[in-house]
């Protein structure tokens, strides 16, 4: 189980289920092969076929899946090539695309905003987005062919990410430098940047970590797509529910006042009091009880105090 103190919508829940897998002496290429085979197997087990209907889409989980780099995806949908661009150039491009960005965002966050706004929703069939810029992936190993990139992929289905994987960064010196870069972003006001250095993690890497690939799959979203459920609340054991309205218990005096109010709402406070025939003490107690129980409210107008039913 995972928890993130973030918002809720049809595909997000603060508490969610994830499957994580780590395999020594493998890389993200191996993990992509494993991921697509796993999801094809899951689709067949659930539906008897690799195809699953989700809303108006028919999703085919049969392997292999297309593999598109982050730079290729952005260039395809926006015409802008992020390769070799500076932070200022990317920020200007984002603003030209009418994407709301600000000066607190570093290069990685800017690229993430462009991809999220212009590209992500277009990938309906399972597609691996690969080779993320280093600034977007502080825990991911540097790409073997391009030091500006990392060996990372995310699997997109129906315009949503359902898997995220790396060739894990196991170099403690490189990892420390990434943490320090995150601190600088946090100082600029980036609320998603890591605001501390995890010295315990660095010490563990110094003792030695073999080449490793790791992946996390959002199981709730995967179940949504395999079972044609449009809301994540439909696939959770304990979904978020509206609080049940408690039945209001009224005294006999409150019932008498409420009966008059319900038939005449809104009504002047003095008129309601007169019709109730209650003594001052009983009247005060009854009207206070009704307003405290949120079944009635008193509002001041230019002419008098008015009472109405809620």
Name these PLM-found stretches.
Residues 1-30, 40, 118:
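Class II aminoacyl-tRNA synthetase-like tRNA-binding/catalytic domains
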Residues 41-162, 179-211:
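Metal-assisted phosphate- and nucleotidyl-transfer catalytic regions
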Residues 172-245:
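Active-site pocket scaffolds in enzymes
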Residues 247-254, 268, 298-310:
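Short, cationic-aromatic polyanion-contact patches
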Residues 254-261:
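Hydrophobic residues on short alpha-helical segments
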Residues 266-276:
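Short acidic, hydrophobic short linear motifs in intrinsically disordered regions
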Residues 278-292:
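Short amphipathic alpha-helical interaction segments
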């Amino acid at each position: 189980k995972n928890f993130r103190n973030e918002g809720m919508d049809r595909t997000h829940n603060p508490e969610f289920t994830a499957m994580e897998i780590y395999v020594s002496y493998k890389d993200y290429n191996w993990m992509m092969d494993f991921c697509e085979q796993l999801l094809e197997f899951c689709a067949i087990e659930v539906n008897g076929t690799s195809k699953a209907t989700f809303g108006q889409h028919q999703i085919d989980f049969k392997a292999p899946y297309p593999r598109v780099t982050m730079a290729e995806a952005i260039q395809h949908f926006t015409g802008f090539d992020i390769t070799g661009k500076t932070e200022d150039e990317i920020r200007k491009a984002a603003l030209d695309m009418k994407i709301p960005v600000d000066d607190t965002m570093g290069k990685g966050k800017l690229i993430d905003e462009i991809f999220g706004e212009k590209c992500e929703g277009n990938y309906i069939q399972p597609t691996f987005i690969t080779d993320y810029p280093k600034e977007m992936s502080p825990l991911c190993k540097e790409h073997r062919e391009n030091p500006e990139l990392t060996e990372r992929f995310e699997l997109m289905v129906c315009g949503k990410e359902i898997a995220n994987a790396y060739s894990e960064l196991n170099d403690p010196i490189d990892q420390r430098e990434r943490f320090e870069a995150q601190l600088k972003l946090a100082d600029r006001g980036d609320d998603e940047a890591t605001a501390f250095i995890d010295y315990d993690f660095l010490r563990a890497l110094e003792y030695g970590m073999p080449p490793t690939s790791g992946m996390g799959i959002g199981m709730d979203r995967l179940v949504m797509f395999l079972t044609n459920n449009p809301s994540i609340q439909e696939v959770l054991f304990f979904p978020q529910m509206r609080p049940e309205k408690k039945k209001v218990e009224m005294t006999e005096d409150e019932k008498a006042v409420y009966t008059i109010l319900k038939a005449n709402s809104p009504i002047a406070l003095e008129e309601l009091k007169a019709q109730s025939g209650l003594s001052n003490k009983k009247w005060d107690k009854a009207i206070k009880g009704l307003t405290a129980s949120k079944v009635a409210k008193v509002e001041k107008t230019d002419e008098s105090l008015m009472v109405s039913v809620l």
